[in-house]
Amino acid sequence: MSKRVVTVPLQGGKVAVNPQFQDALKQIGLDPNAVVQRVQEELKKVGKYPVQKVEVEVVSPSKYEVKIYLPPIGDLLLKLFGKDTGAHDARNEVIGNLSFAQLVEIALLKKDELKSKTLKSAVKQLLSTCKAMGVTVDGRKAEEVLRDVDGGKYDEIINKFEKQWQQ
């Protein structure tokens, strides 16, 4: 059996079970209830972050993977803060604030898209986006936090999650 992809219908951040979705899963040999339960478990992992789409990649009836796609980082931040655009003057305007822990969490969730070799470089990439959009981190300008990351101030926090990044 070649790999098949079934898009999971979502409504309000939850699986919207409909007959077409159930039939598509049954045709592949999957139990729709088990798939829905697994998708819901995966959605819990992304918690409060908006989900762009969810797919079930099926290799065989006994082997499938749930893939959750978040919006691009800029859009993700805008949705988190309920904004339509980033700051018009990012040096002087703030559209929202993230904790450093949230920044690390987003980096881990977006790992496949960031293409960074280390969590530290992924965090730095996110900080650059925050800087351009007018997002502060722990109430401080992103460029200040970036300097602290380069200086090793956040190494303890980053190292705590590095194993998770390497998986």
From Swiss-Prot:
Gene3D superfamilies: Ribosomal protein L11, C-terminal domain. The keyword Ribonucleoprotein applies. GO terms for molecular function: large ribosomal subunit rRNA binding; structural constituent of ribosome. Keywords: Ribonucleoprotein, Ribosomal protein, RNA-binding, rRNA-binding. GO terms for cellular component: large ribosomal subunit. It comes from the Archaea. GO terms for biological process: translation. Part of the ribosomal stalk of the 50S ribosomal subunit. Interacts with L10 and the large rRNA to form the base of the stalk. L10 forms an elongated spine to which L12 dimers bind in a sequential fashion forming a multimeric L10(L12)X complex. NCBIfam families: PRK01143.1 (NF002232). Forms part of the ribosomal stalk which helps the ribosome interact with GTP-bound translation factors. Belongs to the universal ribosomal protein uL11 family. This is Large ribosomal subunit protein uL11. The gene is rpl11.
